[in-house]
């Protein structure tokens, strides 16, 4: 699922994302591709975290 919502990232998470983008670019990926890939990974991680949180809440009922 593609979600255009802005994610709220801590400073540390932002730094990690920047570093990953830089590594991908050093390996030859364009900046646009690197940013898109890291953003996709962040969205997927956020979605998985949200799903796990909802499962936990359901189990507590």
Curated annotation (Swiss-Prot):
Domain of life: Bacteria
InterPro entries in alphabetical order: UPF0181
Family that this chain belongs to: Belongs to the UPF0181 family.
NCBIfam families registered for this protein in UniProt: PRK05114.1
Name of the protein in question: UPF0181 protein MS1074
Species, as recorded: Mannheimia succiniciproducens (strain KCTC 0769BP / MBEL55E)
């Amino acid at each position: 699922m593609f979600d255009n919502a802005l994610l709220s990232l801590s400073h540390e998470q932002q730094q990690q994302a920047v570093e990953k983008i830089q590594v991908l670019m050093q390996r030859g990926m364009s900046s646009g591709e690197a940013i898109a890939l890291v953003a996709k990974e962040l969205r997927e991680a956020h979605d998985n975290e949200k799903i796990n949180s909802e499962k936990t809440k359901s189990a507590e009922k």
